[in-house]
Structure formats: structure tokens, C-alpha cells
């Protein structure tokens, strides 16, 4: 019953939390119209806020009856049972009385909602902890491969320094060899990153499935919506992991092209008799490698932040926080009313699905007391 309590609390609290007074008014007008004068179809059409009225009207009376029965079961929460109050026929009085009743009901139900939010959040934090070693391993590999490349592409040594400062043919030969080394070693590093990227992808799939099993007892969402949310999370994180791997490969391609072009330009300069400074060559290689390292680290950090954002969004979808929580409906408090309304509609559609599941499929009369 705790999941149904959380659903009801969220439903009752959502409208007062909205920044848009017009959105609140539209919902109440639609509620009043649906339960009062159902003959004015054209007025309902203007006030429905893009919801399909047919499906709502077909199930409204039965759902309200079920909710009345459910409210009767809330009596033990306050230590005494009471009959649900009769709703007045006047829409304004109905709205006022409902709001007064809901303030009291919400205060009693919020603890259950907060508990579900915390339990789901704990499981999502566990997912983030489980995936952290994969990204840490990627960063370690980037640092290690950069260090290896720096050693393998070193052009200043006991033998190479004399070649660069010697004749044209010796300098050009060394620079052409550097181009070949760049192509060989960057290609080898690209191959080495494949298994690490694959481990990240497979780890996402495995740990998200574990999340599905662990979060199911605490989520207020219906099983079908829970499954969709988890599958969407898995798909998004997998796509982001593959995109990260592709960017690392692109970074290595760019590194190879830049170093090869630099060595080629130096080789052409040697043909023209330009003096080649070994220190300049070594410094260029170091700078390019450090730029690759820094860019790749930033991209891995971006992936980690995106993972955090996606899991936080899933937490809001599966177990919204209580209305007093700072994270409650933050996206509605924005200037873009069209975007806010779209998010509100999606959130209410999810809520309606969950309530229908709890009232009909789950069986209201068979719920256990919290």
C-alpha cells in the first residue's frame, strides 16, 4: 500500500507546486466540468490541457469511487476512521473543500513518499558506484597510453640528435620514421581501448538489470512503466558509453594526423635545408599528447556527469520526492511555459497509468496496510 500512498501524495501535491497559475486553473476547471456539467463538450475541449477526455471520462466515476474507498482505508494512519466528506456540487466550493482536505491528507502521507524516494535513490547511487570503476579504469588507461606514446615517439636521444643535426638525408629519414611510428603506435592504442569500452557497455547492461530487480519493491511506478524507465536508462547509458569510445578513437585519429602532419612538414623543411631543432620536435610531441590526454579526461568526466543526470531523472520518475523536497517539480519553475506544460502533461500521464495499475490491476481491496 505504500506505493499507492506515494502515488496519491504526489498527485495531490503536484498542482499546488506548479509555478503556472493558468495550469492549475485549467486542471481544476477540467475536473469541475467533468464531474459537473458534462453536456458542454466544447468547453471541456478548451480546458482539457491536451489530455484525451474520452478515456478520462470513461473511467473517472469508477476511479473516484475507488479513491473514496481508498481514503476510507487511511483512517488507521491518524488513529481513527472517518467517512469521506460529501463533495459540494458548486465547482468553487468543491475546489476549496478538496484543497483543505488534501492539505491534511498530504501531511499524513508524505513520510511514505519520502521513504520510497530515498530507497530508490540509494539503489541508483549504488548503480553509480558500480559503474565508477569502469570510467576510472578508462582514465588510468588514457594516462598510461599517453606515457607509453611519449616514450615511443621520443626523437631526442644519443643517436637521433646527431641525425637531426647532420645531413638532410639523415634528418628527413628520421622524420619519416617518426611518421611511421606515430601511425603504428596510435593504431595499437586504439585497439587496446576496445576491450575497456566493451567492458563499460556490458557493465551498464548487467548493473542496470540488477537495479531493476532491487528497485522494484520501492518504486511507485507500475511494473510496465518501471520496465520502460529501466530500459530507457540502459539504452541511454549504453549509447553514451559507445559515443565516449567513439570520441576517444577520434581523439587518437586527430593525434595521429596532427603529429604526422607536423613530422611531414619538418621533413619537407629538411629538404629545403631548414635546421631541425630536436628540442622543438620533442616539445611538440609532448604538447600534442597532453592535449589528447586532457581532452579525453574531460570527455570521460562529461560521461560521468551525464550518467548522474540520467539516474537522477529516473529517481524522479520512479519515486518522486515529497512536495517539501527541493527536487520536487523543479523543471516546472521555469520561464518556458510551453516546455513546462509539456513536462507536466507527460508527468500526469505517467501518474495516471500508475494510479490505474494500483486501483485496477493491483487490486485496491487486497493492498496491505503500510
Curated annotation (Swiss-Prot):
It comes from the Eukaryota. GO terms for biological process: acylglycerol homeostasis; cholesterol efflux; cholesterol metabolic process; lipoprotein metabolic process; phospholipid efflux. The modification Phosphoserine is found at residue 59. Residues 1-21 form the signal peptide. Pfam families: Apolipoprotein. One of its GO terms (cellular component) is chylomicron. GO terms for molecular function: cholesterol transfer activity; phosphatidylcholine-sterol O-acyltransferase activator activity; phospholipid binding. Keywords: Chylomicron, Endosome, Golgi apparatus, HDL, Lipid transport, Phosphoprotein, Secreted, Signal, Transport, VLDL. It is found in: Secreted; Early endosome; Late endosome; Golgi apparatus, trans-Golgi network. Interacts with GPIHBP1. Interacts with SORL1; this interaction leads to APOA5 internalization and sorting either to lysosomes and degradation, or to the trans-Golgi network. Belongs to the apolipoprotein A1/A4/E family. This is Apolipoprotein A-V. It comes from Acinonyx jubatus.
